[in-house]
Amino acid sequence: MKQNGKINIHGPNLCQKMEDNMKLLLVSPLASKSFLGGDFYFRLPYLGLLKVASLTPPNWDVSIIDEKVESLDLTQGADLVGITAMTPAVNRAYEIADSFRSRGIKVIMGGMHVSKMPDEALRHCDSVIIGEAERLWDKALNDCKRDELKSIYRHDNEYPSLANFPAPNWKLYEGKRYLPVHFLETTRGCPHNCEFCSVTNSFGGKFRNRPVDEVEREIQDLKPFEGRFVLKNVVFFVDDNIISNRKHTKELLSRIIPYNLKWTGQASVNIAKNNEILELCKKSGCMGLVVGFESLSQGNLANMGKTFNTPDTYIDVVKKLHDYGIGVTGAFVFGFDHDDESVFDRTIEFVIKAKIDVCYFSILTPYPGTRVYSQMLQEGRIIDHDWSNYNTNHVVFKPKLMKPEKLLDGFHHALKESFSYTAIFKRLWGNGTYKNFFYPMNFGFRQTVRKTIKNKQHFSYEEDPDS
């Protein structure tokens, strides 16, 4: 395998066992068309590849390239390349895989998209990890060393336990130009199975919890970010619902109080019903929560399976969180079957009246593996099969109550009006939340919104012959 002291990356048995450490390159591709959030959003560190790196045995030399913050050299050598990508970045992922395979380098792909579209992915890679990497990654690496790599690795029946979870090695991200946020995971799974969301299909319909002791040890090992940052110890809990298990949440929040963190996460509207958890959020340093309001229409909420959301209570939910000093990032989706052209102005009016700290608007996007994707495919409503457009900024389907062009125009209108200077100050004034966090976030989004609208592409939305 070695010639003149260099690894021969063109040999036929690239993954046979070697005495020396083998070189593993992990890649996170950049989507050709950005999500809303632009540079601000994309400079957040990606936890997925750090977790894969932590599962890799020490006899592999691991490096990570994240195209959000650095360039990938497609001519570099490696014994194995691992690539993970969300749907809008998967075309770029396939380009990268094709390039490395053309030089005889084995490629393994993972992530939500290829887990739902493995046959598509296998046209570009040697192997696909379906589902979560735990208990599968080490098998794939061992098979790779024996040159016996299988095309598919999947869990048999149950999802892996989150106990004995290896902590991510944040040293692999040192020197990279990320925003100063540490990502932590404490739970996986969701029982709600909303029609547009792929979490339940990917991670199961039950909540699985990491032992709080392990989460606390990971927090103890975090190092404050260096540099001229106002907040140096910010944590984002990536759990889809931080209050998924009330007992686990209470123990976790109680344990992290002494660490003087500032943290954010995601929660359902039901958090407003639990004063004890809200008080623990406040004491443990919660700056804000992403709350999935999704829609102002009860009909839409019923269709998507989110019946515990009731629009009549939304303003009270926001006020309750503000009473505890917790900011609210309100997530709304446009394009559901009960949405007509009035939805945009109604939502603009609501977010200002409710004093939502940050608005996160998106266009309904039927991702593979979701119920809405299967339904729209069956109904012939999908009009765009270019995965790079599946980024929540484009319309890839035929809405029921408006034309695709009107959905896109209304989306841009809602963004522009909600992130005007006047709207920002109306939303944030008097909230009692972390201004040195939410004002910069709003101005960052405002800049991205202006860029998004300025570079707006005009689509004809002709019928897709493949739909």
Please give the residue ranges for each predicted region.
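Radical SAM enzyme core and accessory elements
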Residues: 2-29, 58-64, 124, 143, ...
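Structural recognition of alpha->loop->beta junctions
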Residues: 120-139, 280-290, 346-361
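Conserved beta-strand positions
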Residues: 26, 83, 130, 237-239, ...
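Radical SAM [4Fe-4S] cluster-binding motif and immediate context
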Residues: 166-329, 336, 342-345, 349
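Flexible glycine/acidic-rich beta-alpha junction loops that bind and position SAM and/or redox cofactors
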Residues: 29-35, 120, 192, 247, ...
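Acidic, low-complexity intrinsically disordered segments
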Residues: 21-228
